[in-house]
Regions:
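Short acidic/histidine-rich active-site segments
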Residues: 251-258
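Active-site acidic/histidine proton-transfer and metal-coordination neighborhood
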Residues: 4-5, 40-159, 165-166, 264
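Glycine-rich, proline-tolerant flexible connector loops at the mouths of alpha/beta enzymes
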Residues: 16-46, 98-102, 227
């Protein structure tokens, strides 16, 4: 609940909320949240944002049925779209990972489910945006095809610099997970990152360029830093030039995954890299 305060102290201006952090979310103690509880949450977060002069940008939804799969109902999503509207956010972010290897079925399911959410969100002036976030959704060509076939103006993307891993290497994932728990190898010249767990990936620069056409937000992810403060996996100057060339002028969110660092220090290093690279 100190999100607005800490973000303000770190020099940020906008807030992207992780729905899983609140009641009814992925990490919340309560499995569900009532309509009354949702309104109270929105009022509380609005007050905190206002107190610190912050702008509410979007809510990232990580609970509910997989939108890349066949879904009976989308009820878990609707309260969070309502909440985003109450908080004057412009978007909710959803995922389209899918649960099998059937590309055709994933495409059909994704189009149908996104269309339904967009229909619900449109009267509330909320965009429904998709992040490249694993599985088929990390293949920019596949995701662009889905967005192209959702006939709603309030559909879009949230391109993430580092999320182009289509398939994980189970052994490497286990190794990195252990390092994550331990805090990583702090004396390493190149810190281990989640990028190392990937067995199949889409080219990140090509992917960002393709997804920026539909972008209503951007997630600047960092994996780790070298001695010069540059990301060890991502060429930030190249990536941000792609963002600039697209004509995008909205907020750029900071997401730090440098698990060998203190979280606040990683966020500060990410912000510094972002500002230094955006020239």
């Amino acid at each position: 609940m100190n999100f607005a305060k800490i973000s303000n102290e770190l020099g940020f201006q906008g807030l992207e909320y992780l729905q899983g952090s609140y009641a009814g979310g992925l990490f919340g103690r309560k499995k569900e949240i009532t309509l009354k509880g949702m309104k109270e949450l929105a009022m509380d977060l609005n007050k905190r944002a206002e107190d610190y002069g912050m702008e509410n940008i979007l809510i990232m939804i990580d609970i509910g049925p997989d939108l890349g799969s066949k879904v009976d109902n989308l009820d878990p999503y609707y309260p969070w779209i309502d909440c985003a509207s109450e908080m004057n956010c412009h978007s909710v972010r959803v995922n389209l990972r899918g649960s099998d290897d059937d590309l055709s079925q994933w495409t059909q399911n994704s189009i149908e489910n996104l269309s339904k959410l967009c229909e619900y969100a449109k009267p509330l002036n909320i965009n429904v945006i998709v992040e490249n976030h694993g599985g088929f959704s990390s293949n920019a060509d596949y995701l662009v095809n889905v967005i192209d076939n959702v006939n709603h103006e309030n559909v879009g993307t949230l391109p993430d610099f580092g999320n182009f891993c289509i398939k994980q290497d189970p052994k490497k994932s286990e190794e990195i997970s252990k390092l994550f728990i331990q805090g990583g190898k702090k004396d390493s010249t190149r810190p281990p990152t989640l990028y190392d767990t990937c067995a199949e990936r889409f080219d990140m620069y090509d992917g960002i360029e393709k997804l920026m056409k539909f972008a209503k937000g951007v997630s600047a992810k960092t994996h780790g830093f070298d001695s010069n403060g540059n990301d060890v996996d991502i060429d930030y100057k190249r990536m941000l030039q792609i963002v600039k060339n697209s004509g995008y002028s909205g907020f750029i969110g900071v997401e730090a995954q440098a698990f060998t660092m203190d979280p606040i220090e990683a966020i500060q290093a990410s912000k510094k890299l972002l500002l230094n690279s955006y020239s």
